[in-house]
Amino acid sequence: MLKTNLKLSKDIKTDDVKTFCKKIDKIIKTLIGHKLITFTVIDNNLKFCERIYSNNSKIYPIFGQKKMPKNIWSEKVLKNKKHFLCKNKKDIKKIYYDYETIFSLGCGSIINLLVLFNKKPIGTINILHKESHYKKIDLKKIDYLTTYLIPYFLDHQKIMERKI
């Protein structure tokens, strides 16, 4: 059986982000499945984000940056502080500028799991699978995992601040 109850003192090493992210990746893959997963940290001003983990770093490289969009996604995730579920390719095409890359990987549904600290968005876990794979219930199965990422995301925000 997969261990899903992480113990902060034993399982998490704040200096080993990649190993920890791989553990979260494995748990999510077991609980709801995925073809692609990335973790992104949002800067303090909510202007851009930076990828700190990817299970496909050839297509979605680590430390890749992008500006935060101004669309329905940013309204729901950044302003209303809610997780985001996109169930099909039609909706993905409306929202994500890199939809062609997403589709080329065989993905057609997306969960963006919001990571909050003190009620402020600090990052997302981005989980992708085939079209119509994810349902609302899947969010509830995995949203507890976001709390384990908070120390890593806060540390990376400090690194991002030094780059500006």
Each predicted region: which residue ranges?
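A short, aliphatic-rich beta-strand micro-motif
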Residues: 109-116
